[in-house]
C-alpha cells in the first residue's frame, strides 16, 4: 500500500481504475508502479485494493489513487462504487490469452456505462516478456485502441517494461484536461482558476473540455 500524503503535499488527486479479466496482471502492474515490486506467486485479488503514488507532472504534484479489483463475475456488485469518481483507467489484457483481449470490449463498455464516456483510457497488452507465447499480435491491440480512441502500450510487469510510462501517460493526459479547463475558465472571466490545492478532480463535471485521444504506442 502506498504511503498516505496530507493535502498540502500534492496539488491534484486523480483516481485511476485497473480493469480487465482476472489473471492478466493488474495487481502486479500496480505493485510494480507504486512499489517497484513483482510477485511471481501473486494470487487473484479478492474484493478491492488500492495504492497511491505521487509524481510530478508539468511542475505540479499529482497523487494517483489507483484501484484494483478482481475480474471474476462474483464481484460485479462493487461496480458502481469502484468506478465512481474515476478520471482514468488502464484496461489490461494478457497478450498470451486471446480471450482476455476479446473481453476488452465488454470491460470498456462497462467502464463507459459507469463513468464519463470520455474518460482517459490506456489499453495495455501485459506480459510482453512471454514473446514465444503471444496470442494477440501488437497490431490487433493497436487496431482496437484506434477504433475506440484509446492509448495503447504493451507492458511487462515482470521486466518493468513500459509500466511507469503507461501510468504516467494517463496521469499526464488527465492533468492536461484539467489545465485546459482552468485556462478556459480564466479566459471566460471566471475567478475560479485552478482547483484548490489538494482537490480531487472529477473530469465528469466538465466533460465539455474532454476530447477523445488518438492511439499512441511505443
From Swiss-Prot:
Binding site for GTP: 20-27, 68-72, 126-129
Positions of short motif Effector region: 42-50
MF term (GO), any: GTP binding
Keywords: Cell membrane, GTP-binding, Lipoprotein, Membrane, Nucleotide-binding, Prenylation
Keyword Kinase: no
InterPro entries: P-loop_NTPase, Rab_GTPases_membrane_traffic, Small_GTP-bd, Small_GTPase
SUPFAM superfamilies tied to this protein: P-loop containing nucleoside triphosphate hydrolases
This protein's GO CC annotations: plasma membrane
Statement: the UniProt record of this protein carries the keyword Nucleus: no
Pfam families: Ras
Subcellular location: Cell membrane
Lipidation positions, renumbered (S-geranylgeranyl cysteine): 215-216
Topological relation to the membrane, as annotated: Lipid-anchor
Major subcellular location class: membrane
Protein name, as recorded: Ras-related protein Rab11D
Amino acid at each position: 500500500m502506498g504511503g498516505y500524503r496530507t493535502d498540502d503535499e500534492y496539488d491534484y488527486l486523480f483516481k485511476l481504475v485497473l480493469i480487465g479479466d482476472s489473471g492478466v496482471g493488474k495487481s502486479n502492474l500496480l505493485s510494480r508502479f507504486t512499489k517497484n515490486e513483482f510477485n511471481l506467486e501473486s494470487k487473484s485479488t479478492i474484493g478491492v485494493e488500492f495504492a497511491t503514488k505521487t509524481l510530478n507532472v508539468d511542475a505540479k504534484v499529482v497523487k494517483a489513487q489507483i484501484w484494483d479489483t478482481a475480474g471474476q463475475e462474483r464481484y460485479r456488485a462493487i461496480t458502481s462504487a469502484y468506478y465512481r469518481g474515476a478520471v482514468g483507467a488502464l484496461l489490461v489484457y494478457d497478450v498470451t490469452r486471446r480471450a482476455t483481449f476479446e473481453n476488452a470490449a465488454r470491460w470498456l463498455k462497462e467502464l463507459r456505462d459507469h463513468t464519463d464516456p470520455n474518460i482517459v483510457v490506456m489499453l495495455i497488452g501485459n506480459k510482453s516478456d512471454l514473446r514465444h507465447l503471444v496470442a494477440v499480435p501488437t497490431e490487433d491491440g493497436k487496431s482496437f485502441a484506434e477504433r475506440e480512441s484509446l492509448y495503447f502500450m504493451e507492458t511487462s510487469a515482470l521486466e518493468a517494461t513500459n509500466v511507469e510510462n503507461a501510468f504516467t501517460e494517463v496521469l499526464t493526459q488527465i492533468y492536461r484536461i484539467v489545465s485546459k479547463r482552468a485556462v478556459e475558465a480564466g479566459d471566460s472571466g471566471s475567478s475560479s482558476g485552478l482547483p484548490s490545492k489538494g482537490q480531487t478532480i472529477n473530469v465528469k463535471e466538465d466533460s465539455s473540455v474532454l476530447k477523445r485521444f488518438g492511439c499512441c504506442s511505443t
